[in-house]
């Protein structure tokens, strides 16, 4: 990681008065969308300092210290958000909704994806969004279910890929090479990936993933592959110091992270 030119950057306060902001996405040079964990989607003009709350009817549940309204992505007039959805009782999921932004209103705003199954836990939602080549990529955390990230018949611990309207691409692994996978799944074996971006250098999708006690990593999203949680912990251990798996940081057949941190940086 090159920090040689860090002296060329400075911090400037652009807007304040927000309540636990989680995601943001620019509409243009002056306007951006910001989510707050308590459930709001805000449109902010950095030039005029105007703040508008966009109405929606999503069942956002701010649960624990990680759940709530999470990422937001603006793409070609459409707004995509990921959030903690209350499904029934205390059972929740990582869900994605989308709609068109028209005159500061969200039109036809509705769910296009719900991770399954809904369960009663309050951590590890994943939830970061990115668009590449007219596909929507999203991360789903393993909801503290450990080895469930190795079971592609659920969405725990996965990267999913959808068409922009929420339909499933015919080239996804579950419809081609990995017929036992749920059709939305593109990659498995992650723990709690909360960073995702498309590189302007090679147009590939990259993620950052929270390891346990050690093992945070930066890596590439690749079709039909497996990062290995909880067969491996990328050099980390459980929080009580116990070994995860056989203690290996990596095994043959699994994807290697590009860079990992021990101890964890998050």
Language-model segment annotations:
Residues 2-146, 198-211, 265-266:
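Acidic, Gly/Ser/Thr-rich repeat motifs that build Ca2+-stabilized beta-propeller blades
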């Amino acid at each position: 990681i090159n920090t040689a030119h860090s002296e060329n950057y400075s911090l400037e306060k652009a807007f304040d008065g927000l309540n636990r902001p989680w995601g943001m996405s620019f509409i243009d040079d002056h306007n951006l969308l910001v989510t707050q964990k308590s459930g709001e989607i805000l449109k902010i003009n950095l030039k005029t300092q105007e703040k508008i709350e966009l109405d929606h009817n999503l069942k956002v549940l701010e649960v624990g210290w990680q759940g709530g309204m999470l990422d937001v992505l603006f793409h070609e007039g459409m707004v995509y958000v990921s959030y903690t959805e209350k499904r029934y009782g205390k059972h929740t999921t990582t869900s994605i909704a989308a709609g068109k932004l028209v005159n500061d209103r969200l039109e036809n705003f509705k769910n296009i994806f719900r991770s399954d199954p809904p369960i009663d836990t309050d951590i590890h939602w994943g939830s970061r969004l990115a668009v590449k080549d007219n596909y929507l990529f999203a991360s789903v955390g393993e909801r503290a279910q450990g080895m469930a990230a190795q079971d592609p018949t659920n969405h725990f611990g996965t990267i999913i890929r959808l068409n922009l309207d929420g339909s499933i691409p015919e080239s996804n692994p579950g419809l081609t090479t990995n017929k036992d996978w749920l059709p939305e799944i593109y990659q498995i074996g992650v723990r709690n990936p909360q960073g995702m971006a498309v590189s302007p250098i090679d147009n590939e999708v990259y993620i950052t993933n929270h390891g346990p006690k050690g093992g945070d990593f930066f890596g590439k999203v690749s079709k039909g592959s497996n990062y290995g949680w909880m067969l491996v912990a990328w050099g980390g251990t459980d929080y009580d110091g116990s070994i995860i798996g056989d203690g290996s940081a990596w095994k043959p057949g699994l994807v290697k992270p590009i860079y990992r941190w021990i101890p964890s940086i998050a």
